[in-house]
């Protein structure tokens, strides 16, 4: 390549004309049409023509000549129709040299300007040809369609980033957020980015919008969405992450209305035992509307007949129907301090299926004959018709337990049944339950519930007994069902005496995992030879499944097969795991929100253990575990009770900073 040769190279996606000043060791020193002198490797050159300039004419003259050449070539480029050229040659499917392409395009004698114009045109429009130095290969129609779609997508992406970042800046700079009806796509991109980060399908484009707009990448998207009114300041983000919906599909609501209409018609009671004469009661929380279990007791010989009655949801909810499918997809009701998401539509769970006082209801009744020591002498499980006489809260039941003979008898039997379980190796964790409640005004209350109060203890033990007897009944009758089993703890810290708070809290780390399986193994944690769950069919799908297996033994419906039960175990594993996360994290969030108002206050804490840079401590008043820096200077040991000061709290970022008071 001789000095004076006109060449072209690519700079910022544009062709630039230049003249060679020197060519040495595969490096080319050039003067450009923009009056810049630079050096490139010869492989950087896009085109070299056969026209040469006289370098002796001087720099200014050379630049003017280069600019004139560039103008000529641009005009020639504008005459080229790349699509038309492609339509002529694409069926040949072979490489075509530059000279031949230029002749096809312009006809007649071809100059360096013609060749350059073609190179420029094909460089700018990559849709129809791929090129390699001085030859070109036409893309197939399928390739053209694919490249065109990709180009349109990239253009849309660039527009979204540009428009999105401009709009985000406008929102953040304004006192009142602009209307966002036409910006739903941007909102969804930022929403997905904040919820899922790198797992978001919009991660790359969202990152560009955030960067170009100057938005804080960590909390900026959240603050923006709050300002727009898309989210509240206390938005439950896990509901979005897990795709949990409050509302029921219209088809489910229509199906539930049909069930209500059918439920108000006279119902045949063939095969059901009439137990409406029993003095039956429910004991639940103050705000409960979905009553799914009731208790009765009557003297029998030297002992008692204890009845645990479960609403017969399966009598109405057909297996595989729309209501059942929705309940299956939800897996369980979800209870949080500020929200409740039911498994079944409220018009069913809180009315037709609910064991409401004074209303006849179909039920599955577990009738256990107990001696005075609470040993089960005999039992039967029957489909029944029941009528609740009293609906008590835990609070009211506690007040009446020493005055009402029935409650007193149930309480005494519950205590004795628990003692039987404890002697069989049951592990009774005694930990306070923290009740967090957020009212409609956003006011937070945090209280401790004594799970060992008479009313809670008797309900708990009655339900454990019912679940145990149902497990034995299904096992002994050869009906497959989903059992819950648990091996003994890897290490036992708590003996029969109950243990300290430290021992109870630490014991949880050594518990064996609960296993769902069709094999009726022992549940060591409860001290029982078999166990399942039956008593909450309004709130837990597994309990509804158990109920159907019982009904199968009664001839009321076709039970699930073993294959179907295994599928249910597998299908419910994911929703049950995220429901646990939802409930635990939301409760922790509201406890931290409560503590945000107590910064500077002192709280009692218990040391759990010492780690490298911190102590792990428990705040007994809230039953949450957190860290305490080692730089306090004190030498603390597990079980030490200390006083800590709340330094900083941020519920949104899940941070709680303490110092030794």
What is each PLM-predicted segment?
Residues 144-168:
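Short, amphipathic alpha-helical interaction segments positioned at domain boundaries
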Residues 123-135, 231:
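A short, conserved structural fragment
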Residues 121-125, 164, 170-171:
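Mixed-charge (acidic/basic) macromolecular-recognition segments
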Residues 2-6, 10-16, 23-26, 35-46, ...:
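Electropositive polyanion-binding surfaces
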Residues 53-56:
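N-terminal membrane-targeting/anchoring modules of bacterial envelope and secretion proteins
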Residues 58-61, 66, 133-135:
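Negatively charged, Asp/Glu-rich surface segments that serve as flexible interaction/assembly modules
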Residues 173-272, 277:
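Low-complexity, highly charged intrinsically disordered N-terminal segments
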Residues 132-147, 239-240:
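Accessory beta->alpha helical hairpin/"wing" motif in late/C-terminal subdomains of nucleic-acid enzymes
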